[in-house]
Structures are given as structure tokens and as C-alpha cells.
């Protein structure tokens, strides 16, 4: 009997089931991880914006007095809330009250809000990220806030930083070790 060049029906059936399953998994696997990629991108944007706000005094040094809602589109600036001292340099996590109120004022104007988003790196060619910042007591009660309206649902990433504020009477944060302590929260979404 000649058994050469014959395939069994079981082998063909098993191979076709394996290939069909493999192609199905290969087609749908990238869709499973699409949300994870968005979360990672949103998380990095939220971290970057929070770091820029609390670790940078802004550009130019007098941006909080030179920029207002009438010239925010024509002026080039980068908002930063950190205090800059000539002797000590930038004091990270130590925020200037007038810069906080200026950022809140700019974010209340829709044209300025888009400009601030652009200068914080949140307007890319593919996505226009929205963001919201708030200064809160440590129990999460808001003191100062600004930005886009937070949606009820969706993929929102928040990043918190504990900060000091230079003027406890203007922004009444909690007093800890003779310093005015608040929580800065930055939320980013698409």
C-alpha cells in the first residue's frame, strides 16, 4: 500500500482551526490595548502639566502682570506658578498667589484657555487635550479652580501635588509647620 503524499483529514481540520483562531486573535488583540495606550498618554500629560505648574515660575518672569485676557492670544508666555527668588532660584512646590489667580483668570476666558492649553503642550495635531486645575484643602474641598468643565464620565486622569502657598490670607490653605499647605490637582482628558 502506498502511504506517501497523503494528508489525513484530522490534520487538515486541526490546522484550519488553529489558523482561524490565530488570525482572529491577531486581528482583535490591538483593540484590547487601545484604551491602555490612551491612559498612558493622558497620565504623562497630567504629570507634565502638574510639574510645569509647580516647578516652573513661568516665562517671562513677569507673565502674571504682563498677560491678561485682552492680550493673551498675542503675547507669548508659559504659565508657571512656582516662586522664583534671586538668591535661591526656583522654589519647587512653593506657589505664588498672584500667579494662581492670574491662571484662573486666563482659564475663565475661552480664547485664553485655548492659548494656555497650547503653551502647556496640550494641543497636538492628533488630539486637543482638555485640562482642569484646582487648589484644594487636604480634605478635597476646592479653594481655587479653573479650566475646562470636568465631564461626569470618561477617561480622565488626575495628578495631585502637595504644595505650599505664599499667602495664607488670600488662599486660606491648611497651616502645617507654619506653612500654608494645599493640594494641587490637575486633570487631563480628551
From Swiss-Prot:
Topology in membrane: Single-pass membrane protein
Pfam annotation, one family: DUF7287
InterPro entries documented for this protein: DUF7287
Annotated Gene Ontology cellular component terms: membrane
Residues annotated as transmembrane: 12-34
Source superkingdom: Archaea
Compartmental location: Membrane
Keywords, ordered alphabetically: Membrane, Transmembrane, Transmembrane helix
Protein name per Swiss-Prot or TrEMBL: Uncharacterized protein AF_0763
Species, as recorded: Archaeoglobus fulgidus (strain ATCC 49558 / DSM 4304 / JCM 9628 / NBRC 100126 / VC-16)
Source taxonomy: Archaea, Methanobacteriati, Methanobacteriota, Archaeoglobi, Archaeoglobales
Amino acid at each position: 500500500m502506498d502511504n506517501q503524499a497523503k494528508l489525513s483529514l484530522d490534520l487538515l481540520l486541526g490546522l484550519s482551526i488553529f489558523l482561524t483562531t490565530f488570525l482572529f486573535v491577531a486581528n482583535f488583540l490591538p483593540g484590547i490595548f487601545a484604551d491602555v495606550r490612551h491612559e498612558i498618554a493622558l497620565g504623562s500629560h497630567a504629570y507634565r502639566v502638574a510639574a510645569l505648574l509647580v516647578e516652573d515660575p513661568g516665562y517671562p518672569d513677569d507673565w502674571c502682570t504682563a498677560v491678561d485676557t485682552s492680550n493673551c492670544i498675542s503675547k507669548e508666555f508659559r504659565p508657571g506658578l512656582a516662586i522664583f527668588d534671586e538668591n535661591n532660584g526656583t522654589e519647587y512646590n512653593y506657589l505664588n498667589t498672584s500667579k494662581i489667580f492670574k491662571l484662573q483668570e486666563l482659564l475663565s476666558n475661552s480664547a485664553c484657555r485655548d492659548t494656555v492649553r497650547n503653551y502647556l503642550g496640550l494641543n497636538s495635531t492628533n488630539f486637543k487635550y482638555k485640562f482642569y486645575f484646582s487648589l484644594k484643602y487636604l480634605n478635597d474641598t476646592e479653594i481655587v479652580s479653573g479650566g475646562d468643565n470636568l465631564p461626569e464620565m470618561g477617561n480622565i486622569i488626575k495628578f495631585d501635588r502637595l504644595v505650599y502657598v505664599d499667602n495664607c490670607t488670600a488662599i486660606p490653605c491648611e497651616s502645617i509647620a507654619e506653612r500654608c499647605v494645599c493640594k494641587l490637582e490637575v486633570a487631563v482628558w480628551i
